[in-house]
């Protein structure tokens, strides 16, 4: 167990191999977000669908910091918000609203990540949204959609609008709120968010010198990048993911407990 992690009974060997792997990968995502400083204490969430017809998914125990989360501490719920297995923890209602919406609507959305980073929230509140300023932004823009702010996501009726605005894209800017990434794998979900968060940070820094002083990427270059990334984040993410896990093993061990 990692230093500082809350005590949790290990579920290894007590759940299916598929569920255990989803738990380990999801716990890794939480730890990676914490390592990059993109967490917001207990107030954002990442989820993973468990393979199987039940459409159960895993999400963080409400009250646990991202750097404390382990594979065994994650909470399993159904699409109605019912906790499936006995646990001392419960879940964030706003997290359930957002994540249940995407998991129910998108079969390819095995992992869903929602963050409130400073740079992500800042760009979500910018009237022009994410601008084609950098290579990072050009990579994510073709997969980026927008959802207008409706208040804290406690209204279950908002789920339909979140899903409609996301459509078949992989990334969503929640206006005045934050960012969201979906992926068929933990690696794809992570890499999409990594590029989006980097693009947002770069935009905030660039605009600090004034909107009139920044140079947008030429239209031809934007089109070229769109063609070049046709292979998607899945393959690239698969190449980067093992290195991410090695970094966790060095700097945040215990996530797979």
UniProtKB/Swiss-Prot annotation:
Query: GO cellular-component terms in the record?
Result: cytoskeleton
Q: Which residues form a coiled coil?
A: none
Keywords assigned by UniProt?
Answer: Metal-binding, Zinc
Q: Does the keyword Metal-binding apply?
A: yes
Positions with a binding annotation for Zn(2+):
114, 116, 177
State the Gene Ontology terms under molecular function: actin filament binding; metal ion binding
Tell me which SUPFAM superfamilies the record gives: AraD/HMP-PK domain-like
Q: How is the cofactor bound?
A: Binds 1 zinc ion per subunit.
Keyword Metal-binding applies = yes
Cofactor names from the entry are: Zn(2+)
The record's comment on protein family reads: Belongs to the aldolase class II family.
User: What is the protein name for this chain?
Assistant: Putative aldolase class 2 protein CC_1201
> Which organism was this protein described from?
Caulobacter vibrioides (strain ATCC 19089 / CIP 103742 / CB 15)
| Lineage start | Bacteria, Pseudomonadati, Pseudomonadota, Alphaproteobacteria, Caulobacterales
